[in-house]
A protein has these predicted regions:
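Extended intrinsically disordered or low-complexity regions, especially N/C-terminal cytosolic tails and loops
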Residues: 1-60, 117-121, 152-225
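Flexible secondary-structure boundary motifs
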Residues: 64, 68-174, 178, 182
Length: 225
């Protein structure tokens, strides 16, 4: 990211600062000039590595923030659209309880084209990246590392004779962040202006079960004294 600047220049500046500091306390009777230069070089390298780690953390945090904002707005819009022909008291908790894959399936049923699109694949990958960033090891990490190894460019885990990525190896570049952002923009543009209940196919079985579950929760809540 731009605020991290030129890392080579940053390293040289750090070396210069270190040498200026050591020069003030240099004792020619005891100190080795070459050792000071070696220490300055190591100081520059260590500083650059700390910047790289910070940059990676910032990129992951920004990716997570962008995704959560998108996810929230998408669920809110889905509820608004469905409330035109469904009971809002039923669909609101149901939509918020859906995982991201289920939400996309619901939108596909409504009429959006998501599967087998570049932006759909990026959105699904982004969701997995954020889950791994938040929760570490788990199903999301295993799925992401097997289907999208590009987010684990430097695997460090050892399993037998193989090197496998760990959840700590997760990495997002600036280019990949832009791809996620572009996918979100493309998705919003792909949403049709109108969705009509009469054009929907039969409700899939998984959706019927979720609706019934939400109805049951609503009835149970209404019967409480």
């Amino acid at each position: 990211m731009s605020q991290f600047g030129d890392l080579t220049q940053e390293a040289e500046e750090r070396e210069k600062q270190f040498l200026e500091y050591t020069a003030e306390h240099f004792n020619p009777d005891f100190d080795d000039p070459m050792a000071a230069y070696e220490q300055a070089y190591e100081e520059g390298v260590n500083y650059v590595w700390s910047l790289i780690e910070m940059q990676e953390t910032v990129l992951l945090a920004v990716t997570a923030g962008m995704y959560h904002q998108f996810d929230k707005k998408l669920r809110e819009k889905t509820i608004r659209e469905l409330s035109h022909w469904c009971d809002k008291e039923i669909i609101t908790p149901m939509v918020w309880d859906l995982n991201f894959d289920q939400l996309l399936k619901l939108l596909e049923w409504i009429g959006l084209k998501i599967d087998e699109t570049d932006y759909g694949d990026k959105l699904k990958a982004c969701a997995l990246v954020v889950n791994v960033y938040k929760h570490g090891d788990g199903n999301s990490h295993r799925l992401l590392s097997s289907t999208h190894p590009e987010y684990y460019p430097h695997p460090t885990g050892i399993c037998g004779r193989h090197i496998n990525p760990t959840h700590d190896d997760l990495h997002v570049t600036e280019e990949q962040f832009v791809e996620f952002a572009d996918a979100i923009t493309t998705f919003w543009k792909a949403i049709p202006e109108y969705c009509y209940y009469s054009e929907l196919s039969d409700e899939p079985e998984w959706l019927i079960k979720l609706v019934k579950k939400s109805e049951k929760k609503l009835r149970k809540g209404n019967t409480r004294p």
